């Protein structure tokens, strides 16, 4: 049968049929009867439209080989044979220009003379049976149906056959020929029997047994049976007065719908209190890197070897001392912990063979910093369920904190460009389909805009730290393992670079559940003097550990080098998400893509190139107290990426709640801006839900202050 199809039909038709089958995951080599049926249907659609034109006087005419210069327009638009997206685009544009009702299913043709869509059917069964199936499926008075059979019969809506006798005879003759050719090869019987009816989904399938009982049990109040609930739903007119509808739904609801006007919304109330503090798992804008270019030392790529090599590039070490103590901690222990790291690194170098990993000695200072033996003893529930006054610990309410300016500075820094590239352009094979070509073009443009972005550095740093910590937590559960904080990048000249930010020492890590906590101490290099914004560093003990020579415009200057030390903790599930931070790139790329798609649909062509290469155009980036901030497309890419990265770095229940609840208010405000006259009820309750998430988290507080700027400017 496959050979017959390839001989019998025009190659273009065969190719279209193969494409259509592939789109539905069907194989022309296996489902050969279906292959033949699709080709036949395509050919009938093309023959239906062939030679039919509309002339200057809008009269329908038939031209088989006439004056090529005549001003003729095709009478039929062919929809069948296009890919789904394109086909719907054509249907939509016809509906928009002619005002014809949009069909529910894709039709085959559009007739510009009669102004109607046509559904063509070709059947191996009785024409009237097939006609009824088609009509039952499309359920539209507006779409005209025309059925042909291989026996020369036809049937059409209201016996209106659209075409002249001769054109239809051509189609019937061709179908008869196909049938004879098949029969002579012994293919007809199998082909005739393989036709399945139109698949229509029954509107009402009966529910019986357990499902029926469950349905009756789960009805809303005031409904006695599924039938009367169905009748109510079917008769429910969605437009009209909302209050009435609500009271119709339930006797308990009495919502007053208040119009939402420009004067309605008030700004969100941000909490008072001391300024909020840094709570990320590693330093961001304040981090300092010791690095080696073009690493080629022995054991290159083994973190401990790389770290020792980076440490050796710095010569300004000095006796460490505490410059900003941690309010609640035993600060000398932090100092001793750093001295221990230096001493143990020195010991490694004195050994003949450097080990691949380093477990720290379990000294008093590390046991204290890692909370060893601090956790209350776990008791099996069976042993204590009879205790009469068993209860959970009383926990204090979190203390409110106010928004501090450092978090906006952190965000601004994350949007900036660095002088290194943090991700490679993915080596992906040749594009096969045009859509892949557009996708990889977008990916390449986007990568070029964000590869040097500081937020991308944070992604790679986060992925590295979380991967290393999770590995060590599983591989060395009882050990206090020393984990270097490393990242890799390329310089402008394309040279490889390995960076060391500092070290982590992990505590005991018997992590059975996703939420079991592993404690760690982080020690990170920085040039930031903590005394400038002490509130930011509330959770840290900061040491001064050396002096660094920096090249500036006026020559070399010496700056003190600090070490930011703190106790921290994470869990398996947090590390798992940290390892997947690269998803932030994907999320922001998708946001940019939807902007490109919007442009492209207006211009009706792919706008990717223009979008990225038109440097003069500016785009809205965000709201600030000054109004809407605008910037280049690159700036938009980097801002969206930074938002996504900060959502990951500062993930918290407060952020989840704020995002979900503030979105509702945002949509209402946008509806007002679009003059949709929104109405609300219990707006106070919505404000309460949003504001209960504004406690002390720096990223949530910053988002809330941005939200207030948006409210101010959006509703001016």
UniProtKB/Swiss-Prot annotation:
Sequence positions that bind Mn(2+) 1: 41, 108, 119-120
Localization in the cell: Host cytoplasm; Host nucleus
Main location: host cell
Cofactor section: Mn(2+)
GO biological process: cap snatching; DNA-templated transcription; symbiont-mediated suppression of host gene expression; symbiont-mediated suppression of host mRNA transcription via inhibition of RNA polymerase II activity; viral RNA genome replication; viral translational frameshifting
GO cellular component entries: host cell cytoplasm; host cell nucleus
Enzyme Commission numbers on file: 3.1.-.-
Intervals of motif Nuclear localization signal 1 (NLS1): 124-139
Enzyme class, broadest EC rank: hydrolase
Cofactor note text: Binds 2 manganese ions per subunit.
Presence of the UniProt keyword Hydrolase in the record: yes
Single annotated GO MF: metal ion binding
Listed InterPro entries: INFV_PA (IPR037534), PA/PA-X (IPR001009), PA/PA-X_sf (IPR038372)
Sequence positions that bind Mn(2+) 2: 80, 108
Keyword field: Cap snatching, Endonuclease, Eukaryotic host gene expression shutoff by virus, Eukaryotic host transcription shutoff by virus, Host cytoplasm, Host gene expression shutoff by virus, Host nucleus, Host-virus interaction, Hydrolase, Inhibition of host RNA polymerase II by virus, Manganese, Metal-binding, Nuclease, Phosphoprotein
Post-translational modification: Phosphorylated on serines and threonines by host kinases, including human casein kinase II.
Pfam families in alphabetical order: Flu_PA (PF00603)
Purpose: Plays an essential role in viral RNA transcription and replication by forming the heterotrimeric polymerase complex together with PB1 and PB2 subunits. The complex transcribes viral mRNAs by using a unique mechanism called cap-snatching. It consists in the hijacking and cleavage of host capped pre-mRNAs. These short capped RNAs are then used as primers for viral mRNAs. The PB2 subunit is responsible for the binding of the 5' cap of cellular pre-mRNAs which are subsequently cleaved after 10-13 nucleotides by the PA subunit that carries the endonuclease activity.
Subunit relationships: Influenza RNA polymerase is composed of three subunits: PB1, PB2 and PA. Interacts (via C-terminus) with PB1 (via N-terminus).
Listed name of the protein: Polymerase acidic protein
Organism of this sequence: Influenza A virus (strain A/Duck/Hong Kong/2986.1/2000 H5N1 genotype C)
